């Protein structure tokens, strides 16, 4: 990757954040009575982003045992919207007469294009934000401005500029008492909640490990006639402005657990990474492996690794080592330092956390309760992953404060399929890729 491809776009964030907060705050604080008057009323939902995760979240919303109705859908691509509508409708039909949720999205409430979210959000009480994460900040801002409750998928940004926008909007969401749940579902997973409640058993946490190692994800090949912007939008996982690299899009789950149990965020990071296996033209500009050493304010260190390499061993887990014991997260177990079990969660009792997060969100909305304010933590855990990416791309020690205030903005100035993409391939068809020791931040 050339330096110019990932340069810092310096912005006056004090001015920008103040203007943004003022604009969002200027929108009226919507009372419960204005948009939802009681437990027997329909809770109207708009789905923004109709890919796999948007489809899954829509089904989970409809399965929440509340009177939920999907009334609008929005996506950049018509075929993705149509697939989502078909699949959600089929799942609802499979639930049979016992289904309480419903879908009512006629043609006039199916919106396509980069601006589709602006047309769908006003029609709903709750919005599901499930586009590629590069769009999350602008969609979250708009939903907060319009006074909507929100479920938004992780990560909530792909660069520090986006993190700043989410943090500014999160403050306004709290003022408006808008419930916001972020899809870091381990916070809603029974075994993790039980481990968190008993974490003091291991004494002071001195070190941590986190893994997301597996084969990787899909590839969507370039098709004839696609503009560069359309191709990147279709194959979004492999472009940093849209995905954030897999350390951000996927490994954020593990990093978030570490932050949660630690009760704080890292102060600096250093690491390494690269592309050894996944390095064809269709693999864009992201790495296939990252290793990051995160330092926390109390001196404890997290050793973090994520890898996308077919045929290698798989592991998705977190481990905490304390002065008196260890927490083995995936196993739901706490042991002493010699391996003796001190606590074991009964995994047979575990509910589906993807469903639980929707059950709890929609139950709160149905009761007129303000219970969830996940956006700030979602932004800071997103920034944790971005900090690691900045360290692996550059090969340098990256300070948290400098990184989050860097002004790094990877996004295009214009969103349109015929607009210039933020990064372009060279004459050989390959995209520029970060080079540790050369790439600067």
What is the meaning of each model-derived region?
Residues 92-129:
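A structured beta-alpha segment of the ubiquitous adenosine-cofactor-binding alpha/beta core
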Residues 131-134:
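N-terminal glycine-rich "phosphate-gripper" loop used for MgATP/nucleotide binding
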Residues 17, 22, 56, 249, ...:
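C-terminal helical cap and adjacent loop that interface with cofactors, partners, or active-site loops
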Residues 2-21:
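N-terminal secretory signal peptides and thylakoid transit peptides that target proteins
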Residues 126, 137-186:
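Beta-strand-loop-alpha-helix segment that lines the small-molecule cofactor/substrate pocket
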Residues 20-100, 258, 438-441:
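N-terminal Rossmann-like dinucleotide-binding module
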Residues 49-53, 174-182, 186-284, 310-312, ...:
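Predominantly a Rossmann-like dinucleotide-binding segment in NAD(P)-dependent oxidoreductases
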